[in-house]
Amino acid sequence: PVWAVEGDIKGCFDNINHRLLLKKLWRIGIHDKRVLKIISQMLKAGYIDQDLYHATEMGTPQGGILSPLLSNVYLNDFDWYVGRCYLEPHRQCKHKCNDTRRLKWSGITPKYNFRYADDWVILTSTEQEAFRMKHELTKYFKHRMKLELSQEKTYVTDLRKNGIHFLGYIVKAERKRKTPDPATWSDNLVGKPFPDMERLTKKIHTLQKEVRKIGLYTQSNTQAAQIQYVNSVIMGLAQYLQPSICSHAYHAIDRRVNNTALAVWKNLFPKQYNQMQVPLKELSNLPHRHEGYDSKTFAIQIDGKWFGITYAFITHSRYESKPFDQKMTPYTEDGRRRYVNYRTKHKPLPCDRPSINTPEDIALSIYASGKGWKANFEYFMNREYAYNRDKGKCKCCGRYFSELIPKHCHHVNPRLPIERINKVPNLAWLCIPCHRMVHNSPIPPELDAKAVRKIKKYREKLKK
């Protein structure tokens, strides 16, 4: 589908009909009249503005905990209406995929509905069907839902020419990017999400105001707290844009924040603002995020420690490799299993797995604790945590451990003092062949390139 109907409901939350809402609540199964009465009284409670009481005959209160749920109940009929227009009244086959194929052969155009709160998009295959749906839904909202579609903001869009605006993204239909392997090239269109730069620019302006507030404070502790708040906003924006093609958006955030920080630091430290630029890896705030990055950022020094502004580009793009499974839910066993399969690449470790440590290992650890040996009690306890962290697989080749693939626990840096050598970050689980290769055993030429890089990385850490 390359044609889209972008819908905009005029004042959706302010124009919800209370009578219809209560009827819909009854229809979905809320039959306790006391609960319905409480909801009705909440909806009609009104509000006071400048000492004047205003009655609320329509709409749901904005910002309330219950309002998003009530609006979803109200618009649930719209979702089912679009579904019934395509598939539900025509069910003949046992499996839905066969029905879809049958409807396609009979000339019925498929439709896909996406809705988040009051923002919705319907995808279809032809321009004629898109305009027909727009006209039909205008009448449906007016007569059945007692709401009005904004004709100025409800568009019919060709995704091949213009993208649809949805939840801060612009989604376009374009050809897949070509890879080095010609066998994977295809002329099929795919949906590509891009950040909505117009909306992002407004967010960046708000972020720049927060950066300027750093210059209003005189105490370094207050400045550091404001820097932490700015960092949380930057990371929040970056993580929201993660599923899209967002490198240009990240650079826009970093460029404008850095320019604003330059002006603030010039005002705070007129003679030494250049010395206040330090590499990210030297910052004491967010050390795991900044590890290994040499890009310089503006920072302040407190008790010999640097606290600086982070960069958005550190948050890498992450595309969803699997389509969303609508049967995921925390309320059923099947829904929870689907969630685990959707969110994790591999099956989680079983909760009842046997301990790695044998009774002989524990006895050896107790004997070794007072003698300064590496294999002390802390080692045998922490390697259990390291095994869980590594998800029961080799850190180099990625194979899962079993009776056929035995394992060793490797010390990343064996020259650390005894109080640091057995900490969890210094332990890594490797299969025996990879462990031997780390300790200078020959690397076979057929080994995966990614595994070779990891083995060489562990070798370098042994030499330091």
Feature roles, as predicted:
Residues 6-7, 56-65, 117-123, 213-219, ...:
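Glycine- and acidic
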Residues 398-432, 442-446:
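Histidine-centered nuclease catalytic patch
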Residues 350-396, 419-421, 425, 458:
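Short, charged surface segments at domain edges that flank catalytic/cofactor-binding sites
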Residues 1-151, 156-159, 163:
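Conserved polymerase palm-domain catalytic core
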Residues 93-108, 149, 375-383, 391, ...:
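Flexible, glycine/threonine-enriched loop-and-boundary segments that flank and lead into catalytic domains
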Residues 215, 222-290:
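Non-catalytic, peripheral interaction segments enriched in hydrophobic/basic residues
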Residues 263-368, 372-373:
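Acidic catalytic cores of enzymes that act on phosphate-bearing nucleotides/polynucleotides
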Residues 40, 44, 50-53, 145-229, ...:
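A conserved non-catalytic segment of reverse transcriptases
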